Regions:
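Alpha-helical scaffold domains
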Residues: 1-166
Length: 166
């Protein structure tokens, strides 16, 4: 599917991988990496981060691979590294999340900053105190976009940063 020119084939490939994600194993990560880097755009990459996340959640020994991806030259690998724990809720590895986000602070790239914000926002539904503390500790290095997205569900805390966001 990823060799075909039309985007619809990549969508079909992502849908298929999502359907079989529980069958995938660490040995599939190199091929997934190739898919992430093939005709990359947010719509397919964001589907693949769930597939990668499923593998990492079942095989924690793969976490170092995501740390490697978090510093890659390829923004799409970095985006998957940042967002692969979306939906993990209380199973989120905060040490890994923090390290991956810290590897991507002070970025100008929209897709990286948006991913950081989404990752923080998603986890704030489970642990708003952790997200508040993280944003407070790194507010000078996070983009306004990341802060705005990440603080969306943390209540009045968000008001503290509105002056910087506007």
């Amino acid at each position: 599917c990823f060799k075909r020119e039309e985007r619809e084939f990549q969508y079909a490939g992502v849908d298929y991988l999502l359907a079989i994600q529980d069958c995938l194993v660490p040995e599939n990560l190199p091929k997934l990496k190739q898919y992430i880097q093939t005709k990359s755009w947010w719509d397919t990459v964001d589907g693949l981060d769930g597939v990668v996340g499923s593998i990492v959640q079942r095989y924690p020994e793969c976490k170092p691979i995501l740390l490697e991806w978090s510093v890659a030259d390829d923004i799409w690998l970095r985006r998957v590294a940042i967002d692969h724990q979306l939906g993990f809720k209380s199973k989120t590895d905060t040490v890994l999340l923090e390290e991956i986000i810290k590897n991507n602070l002070n970025q100008k790239e929209f897709f990286i900053n948006k991913a950081i914000g989404w990752s923080l926002r998603d986890f704030s539904k489970t642990n708003p105190d952790w997200v508040r503390a993280f944003i407070s500790a790194h507010k000078d290095d996070l983009s306004s976009l990341s802060i705005r997205e990440g603080s969306k569900y943390v209540g009045s805390f968000r008001l503290l940063y509105l002056g910087r966001l506007i």
